[in-house]
Amino acid sequence: NINNVSSGGLCTNINVNDVVVHGIPGQRKLKSGDVVGIDVGIWWKGFHTDTSTTVAVGSPTPSIQKFLDTGKEALNKAILLARPGRRIQDLSISMQRTVETAGYSAVRALTGHGIGRHLHEEPAIPCFVVGAYATSPKLVPGMVLAIEIMYNQGTSDVVYQNADGWTIATTD
């Protein structure tokens, strides 16, 4: 869990199908058609990392491939916009437009973030538009960002799943 990363080490979350983030690895056997997000955080020499990728098990259906391609497109566009002088909202506008144009919903309960000596630092980087553009933080040289595209096929609603108090899944 996240405490392992904060005290030094590695944290891996495995998010299967309706799990958006923080899926706890277990004995579940994956099957063809599953969508699996692998989220890895490492604390090394006083600094944190946070990275993830999402893949399909086996050959994805056309609708699953479109879903995965949309996430990659949204991330790539946001990365291209992440330049000094831009505002966080430039990234948010692009991510929200990309996922919603494809027919998906941007998750509003979770955001990307700055990262460095602490796992979650300012600025928050939502994949949806919030607040006034003029008050959105400006990107400056030296910022390290964890740009996270969190989106659902259904509604944007998420909920803590099970009794673990950690796993967050879609509500539909």
Describe every region a protein language model picked out.
Residues N1-D172:
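Active-site neighborhoods and metal-handling regions in enzymes and metal-associated proteins
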